């Protein structure tokens, strides 16, 4: 994927960039794989905000993605590469030999007409899915399961991948892009290759309105709020925060504090913690 930049003919276009969508082959999604998508605006089932700065945005439908890749030993052919408004990665529509259609995350290098297959005996080829124990050390993978049969949970966004660095008994050691090294059961599945659309993170939205189209609402500084809304709020004019360290809106220390639960059961599977 390439990035397309605009000439600064208006204030909104100055510094703005968009994806060239050169890899996209159709603008019409597969109807049988679309379901309604309700915008929760960052609220939970009690109506309370659990994720800030969410809401609004254009109406969209959810594309049903096959994260499990459990259709074994049936060859599928890539019919289209499509844009998905619900994620940063592109998706590929697969026509299987038995007539079924499924969407998968489109890895880098996957093109229309390419054949893919899932199963323990699959070839080590981009787009194929197989258990981690059957994949050679040094291979780059994505859409990695944490529990066998649950579906991929790691390395699913644009440009994401992990590398297999060794095997230990029933576990496989993965190096993630965050530099974290962790154990994953060898019976968990992963797909060969890295996710495409890798330049997505370089896109400059250019104006606030474009973020609103995506359902992203403004982020207000704590120092601009009242003291009953944020620990940084209040004071006369541009007052300092008046605390030893920056605080979250809920009064907890922000920046530089480890937020992971010390008693989390999966801590023993993390060999080296992430550095970024």
From Swiss-Prot:
Q: Which InterPro entries match?
A: NA-bd_OB-fold, Rib_uL2_dom2, Ribosomal_uL2, Ribosomal_uL2_bac/org-type, Ribosomal_uL2_C, Ribosomal_uL2_CS, Ribosomal_uL2_dom3, Ribosomal_uL2_RNA-bd_dom
Annotated GO biological process: cytoplasmic translation
Which GO terms label this protein's molecular function in UniProt? Answer: rRNA binding; structural constituent of ribosome; transferase activity
Q: Does the keyword RNA-binding apply?
A: yes
Q: Which keywords are on file for this protein?
A: Ribonucleoprotein, Ribosomal protein, RNA-binding, rRNA-binding
Give the Gene3D superfamilies listed for this entry. Answer: 2.30.30.30, Nucleic acid-binding proteins, Ribosomal protein L2, domain 3
For the keyword Ribosomal protein, the answer is: yes
Supply one GO CC term from the record: large ribosomal subunit
Q: Where is this region: Disordered?
A: 221-276
Q: Which domain of life is it from?
A: Bacteria
Q: Where is the composition biased (Basic residues)?
A: 252-263
How does this chain assemble? Part of the 50S ribosomal subunit. Forms a bridge to the 30S subunit in the 70S ribosome.
What task does this protein carry out? One of the primary rRNA binding proteins. Required for association of the 30S and 50S subunits to form the 70S ribosome, for tRNA binding and peptide bond formation. It has been suggested to have peptidyltransferase activity; this is somewhat controversial. Makes several contacts with the 16S rRNA in the 70S ribosome.
Q: Which family does it belong to?
A: Belongs to the universal ribosomal protein uL2 family.
PANTHER family linked:
LARGE RIBOSOMAL SUBUNIT PROTEIN UL2M, RIBOSOMAL PROTEIN L2
Name of the featured protein: Large ribosomal subunit protein uL2
**What is the native source organism of this protein?**
Phytoplasma australiense
